Amino acid sequence: PSFKRGVHYPTALVQIATLERCYLFRLTHVGLPVEIAEIFANPNIRKVGLAFKDDINGLRRRRDFKPANCVDLQAIVCKYGIMELGLQKIFAIIFGKKISKAQQLTNWENSHLTAEQARYASTDAWATLSIYLALQKVKPLSKKAVESLKRAEKEAQIQRQMEAMEKKVKGENEKAKGEEI
């Protein structure tokens, strides 16, 4: 990952998961193989990701292809009443379990993946697929219900900000009173 605005490193790893297996493809030394680009371009194969647009753009910088049948979980979870956008939080909401994100900010371009990196990458891909399949089993909320949830979430966020500001002002006032004495 890059921690500087506008700086992009080439995509170093592609994860392709089924419920039983996850395949990790290191792209650092070989680029994007034609066969993997063909999977992403195949309209008969659904691809699911989280913040998928950036991932697809990164892959397209390695080899041009026209993506087809790609689903971004961040674009659909709100239709199911989930306002969180991070994989760990979405997974916890749906399954009531926590997944580790300890290796998220790691160097995927290392010459060898550690066991922890491979486990993280595999879990990440499997969790994304599991969330998508779980959502397919339930009916999405109506547009009106989604809008209502978004408004409620925004109001709750404003309320939390107001409470934080009040707490800060109260602390500053108490500190000022203490200095007067």
Regions found by a protein language model. Name each.
Residues 3-120, 126-134:
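Conserved DEDDh/DEDDy metal-dependent 3′-5′ exonuclease domain
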